[in-house]
């Protein structure tokens, strides 16, 4: 399973680019006078402002310019900026760790990425403190994936527990969610631990864990079965953009014979573009691409089944084949599993 890096944590002592710019009188006046500005205009103006501050010796402006490049997807420029200040700015060091590990703006070098994250985790400097939980999560990811270090689930678990910090909302919520996923997929499974960590992460706002909790309630995994609680979690997660929760709601509607509702809901999900929408949704929701694809595959399969049998929609076997094929492309293993249920007339 391919995981994703923890985004740069917010530092209460550092302003963001937008906050930094908003406090600048020249920038504020420019926005007031120019009412038809675009995003590109704002970026250009922010870069101009940051350049002026850099020339005046503002050390924070160096990092903020690199971060602006990073957020705009100009990774080569961001890398160059962060490399210049890595010895003076822990946030730059952190971002370099992410960029080398994920190959953003440079050739992928997982070992170098791991080294930068270890520097953050081992740093005694108070200015690195807010980065330590996130660095521990990223190091746990490296051990889990076996990239840059020798693979070790035990070391990954140890680091994620450090990062999760007993459910602290100011720690790595991503690590809390990952522990929920880890305990529910390892052998042997530890479902009560999985439920605990998904509950902690969900309480701290994690969208992936909210959907996972819904499924654990629905099937009585690690907790007593509770359909009402399951549907509440799944619906709220679906409304917030969790595609895997959406796919599982489609399955629930089909099994409950709410075919009209199933068709309407499944079509919207099944029509997501598998190439462009999955990475975009992952970026916006911070959900894992694998589960986004799984949710889309589930919706595609059930939409195809409704079309094939004329359930809640006019029968159309040609279009049904299109959606069956899409389900197979998105997740062959899931499509095969659902096809087996279909053959046994379970769906």
Curated annotation (Swiss-Prot):
What do the Gene Ontology cellular component annotations say?
Answer: cytoplasm
**What subcellular locations does the record give?**
Cytoplasm
Note the segments forming the Sel1-like repeats: 93-125, 133-168, 173-206, 207-242, 243-277, 297-332
Top-level taxon in the UniProt lineage: Eukaryota
Q: Where are the transmembrane segments?
A: none
Gene3D superfamilies, per the entry: Tetratricopeptide repeat domain
TPR repeat positions: 59-92
* Keywords tagged on the record: Cytoplasm, Repeat, TPR repeat
UniProt cross-references to Pfam families, sorted A to Z: Sel1
Say what the protein does: May act as an adapter that regulates LRP2 function.
Subunit details for this protein? Answer: Interacts with LRP2.
Q: What is this protein called?
A: LRP2-binding protein
Question: Which gene is this protein's source?
Answer: LRP2BP
